[in-house]
Amino acid sequence: EIRARFSSAMSEMYRDEVPQYGTLIELVADINQRTLQAEPELLARMQRSGELARLGVERHGAIRVGTAAELSMLRRLFAIMGMEPVGYYDLSVAGVPVHSTAFRPVGDAALLANPFRVFTSLLRLDLIADEALRAQAAAILARRNIFTERALALIAQSEANGGLTDAEADEFVGEALETFRWHSESTVDGTTYDALHKAHRLIADVVCFKGPHINHLTPRTLDIDAAQAAMPERGMDAKDVVEGPPRRDCPILLRQTSFKALKETVRFAGDATGAGSHTARFGEIEQRGVALTRKGRALYDQLLAQVRDMGSAGSAALDYGSRLAQVFEAFPDTHEQLRRQDLAFYRFTLSDEGAALAAGEAAAAAASDLDALIARGLAQAEPIVYEDFLPVSAAGIFQSNLGGEEQKQYAAHAAQQAFEADLGARVHDEIALYEQAQQRSIDQLRSALRGQATKVAA
């Protein structure tokens, strides 16, 4: 699988470029092992669902590009790895001048095999207020090519031939990796860098380098609070608060934290005497919970708005965690409640008892409602993991790792249609994907019972 090869190669490259990332991987592995030993029910559930096998795979990376042409070619590059654009994220409402999607696998089997995803942001030059600076940034971006000639040739070849040979796939991974490699030489002089940096640190990060260097890679932890507490012990400067919902018995959506971005030496164009510095790359950790339905997401957004109204969300205020926990007491915290109230998505499978039903019982069970099947122990509901991102969390992570507290207010304008035009495709509605996954499992459950009834009767 090309996606697995690419994910592994990128992890090795990033470990070489940012040694602290290797420490982060070790920390997460230690915490996951301890958590599974302490929680046998969690271990059993992850074994049943197939989640355990994929736990050690790095879950996502993130890049930022500057032009529609770069974004569109990335879509074609990721398609070769079985990754499609899912979701639209307008981060400008949180003061970050980008909008984004996540390239990831969408099928159940593909996600179990390797859930690697890349959160990909496109710079919105229209949000640079200074017209001359905006034109200068556009001209700089127009001069660069972030893909190797061989990578472009292999993309075209794969599209024409319906895939790549094994040897071509290895070559493709090596060529594609060059797009995401860090370059310590800036493509602009120090004066230009400073002007773009003053407009927004992220603008400088996108415009002033040869390509969209991977700015973080993220392993998945089963206990993000333990990871947050342990990071300083391993010499990592952790961000102040964990982004996302509070700690719960039944984790929902996504929680994220990171070690703060490293200050790295860069050499500016035309500067032979000294070196400058740039801050962008960091290490992130995530804990994933159950995916929420539209009803569940509406409740989540409503509660988060209440927390924001009580104070500055994402700030290091001492009582932020307390406010979050207090407000989220209104969000049900058992899987039975979440399922019965249609707040979260589940994958339904036959239990051993259900698989052993006699013909008449199986036929009757096939027509029963899900609650009845679960109550009788004939079916089980496993939470569907949330595979996507939270706009507010993503913006909070970006802000904390760009080295400042500025929250530049851009007009709250979600330009999804323009983004899709630049991308060259529509993005998937992520909630629709979870709806389909849940319905597939229900259909398969009923089909299995009907097949069992026919088989036993025969």
Briefly describe each language-model feature range.
Residues E1-A458:
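Extended, well-ordered protein cores
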